[in-house]
Amino acid sequence: MNARVEQLEFQAEARQLLDLMVHSVYSNKDSFLRELISNASDALDKLRLEAFRNKDLDVDTSDLHIQIEVDKDARTLTIRDNGIGMTRAEVVDLIGTLAKSGTAELRQQLREAKNAQNEAASEELIGQFGIGFYSSFMVADKVELLTRKAGESEATKWESSGEGTYTIESVENAPQGTSVTLHLKPEDTEDELHDYTSEFKIKSLVKKYSDFIAWPIRMEVERRTPATEEGGEETVTREVETLNSMKALWARPKDEVSEEEYKEFYKHIAHAWDDPLEVIAMKAEGTFEYQALLFIPSHAPFDLFNRDAHTGIQLYVKRVFIMGDCDQLMPEYLRFVKGVVDAQDMSLNVSREILQQDRQIKAIRRRLTKKVLSTIKELQSERPDDYRTFWTQFGRVVKEGLLSDFDNQETLLQLCSFASTHSEEEATTLAQYVERMKEGQTQIFYATGETRQQILKSPHLEAFKAKGYEVLLLTDPVDEVWVGTVTEFDGKPLQSIAKGEVDLSAEGEESQAEREEQQKEFADLLAWLKDTLSDHVKEVRLSNRLTDSPACLITDAFGITPALARLYRASGQDIPVGKRILELNPKHPLVTGLRQAHQDRADDPSVAETAELLYGTALLAEGGALDDPARFAEILADRLARTL
């Protein structure tokens, strides 16, 4: 008896998103079958694991499988599994996927990809957002889902035509597991809508996309036996056939697995639509035996910077699925790596808490990490185009490892690439920077900022450009943090151009005598400015890093920069920023004029106002925020009025 029937509407954003998918954002509509089979496989994995861990769960796991059923007359295709199943609440949550955070972003990106006729990008985005189930609507006018959770008596039926509404109801007498029935659209070769009731078509799709699935995929097929006697009729029978080989790819030698098989396996475990950038197959024997098949994606997922997102490494023990996102197997900064690890000497009853203390898991993690890093190193040296693709997509998170993985810090530094003043187009490694260092240069100079353009306009950079020193341009938020942890590379200290003392006078353009003379000439002004601007600065001194600007602000060698303080505050840590150092260009007309004005009329309020303007312009030039914008604007407006 049916009960609790509800007809609900997709939320506005979800309805628009579904509409985008229904109207051909998939270039390859065949992929819907891969998605449904992958979901069924996941459900079987979960049931086997739950049955092992929960001895009170009374279920039969002796014949777990996926069944494909075709009804040519009704033009329906059903994918059925006897896996874990779902409760009504879980079905509602599945539907809610479309309405969760990120929907607006996905919809916008899909629309842009569609407008640009970039179908591959559209597929990739849908895969990233984990809603491949809805690809069913590319080939079906209506989709029905019937499911019963293992151990529950009540089942749930969900139905939708993809036009803004769906129904959900509770039903009885349904088998355990989940079935998805597609009411297929008419064939349309121009729109790549094939006959998905064709036995040959279904068998070829399973072989192409899902041959490696660990569970048998069965379908009733037609068998024709030729007549044994002349004039007799052929015999037609129907029998159930297993369509897939069920061979675990990670257990097969790499030279026996085709590139296409690896691609399809990656798409299965990563729920991706693009091809992997690199495949890593490993086998370890000895103390800890395990096999691993890892993939470096070619595109970053939308949730790359969401630390709660799944890591993508599946853990098996002797080919038995244990968990789908084993974060203990890969450091957080490599969370984009997808794949499978199959350990041989571990309990099937392992939990996340046990894994955190497991010596074998820690050893496997170390080896996997080193293998991934060495693979990236090979990309860097042997396939520079692929390395550039990798670094563009994942470089920002790899640099997080400089803060946490001290064992591999040197390797990570070698892998990193940075923009620099050497080239507008090409990034540079630290090793390449060191090779280009000027004679007598002992430090690696860098600058941090929000954008390349902002840094290039910074007063701090002036003397470095004038004297031909290359400067690394670091624009990722994580750069502000790791440069405080990493002190050197290849024996060369890393030096911020905006922190501490920088000596660029080694080329002899400015004699020591001239420098000492300037110190005497500006001594009174420096002391007066330190007192006048005492609320803002701790020290005022002459600069050897300025050539065009009148002034700039410097942080102590070991001080916290304002940008770093902002990052800490954004993460909930209120870090106070100490007073900074104001450096003056002794050759700039504004500075020499201020010195003369101070000598002539030190008590004139306008001289103090000029000091405020000088400090404010230095703050603005580096992209900082004024403490009192109204006061600054008032003084500036008064000065401008006097010039007219």
UniProtKB/Swiss-Prot annotation:
B: where is this region?
353-566
> Where is the region C?
567-644
Protein keywords: ATP-binding, Chaperone, Cytoplasm, Nucleotide-binding, Stress response
SMART domains in the cross-refs? HATPase_c (SM00387)
Q: Sorted alphabetically, which InterPro entries does this protein's record hold?
A: HATPase_C_sf, HSP90_C, Hsp90_fam, Hsp90_N, Ribosomal_Su5_D2-typ_SF
Q: Which GO terms describe its molecular function?
A: ATP binding; ATP hydrolysis activity; ATP-dependent protein folding chaperone; unfolded protein binding
Q: Does the keyword Secreted apply?
A: no
Q: Which Pfam families match?
A: HATPase_c_3, HSP90
Cellular component terms (Gene Ontology): cytoplasm
Segment A: which positions? 1-352
Instruction: Report the locations given in the UniProt record.
Output: Cytoplasm
Q: What does this protein do?
A: Molecular chaperone. Has ATPase activity.
Q: How does it assemble?
A: Homodimer.
The Swiss-Prot or TrEMBL record describes its family as follows: Belongs to the heat shock protein 90 family.
PANTHER family, per the entry: HEAT SHOCK PROTEIN 90 FAMILY MEMBER (PTHR11528)
Protein name (record): Chaperone protein HtpG
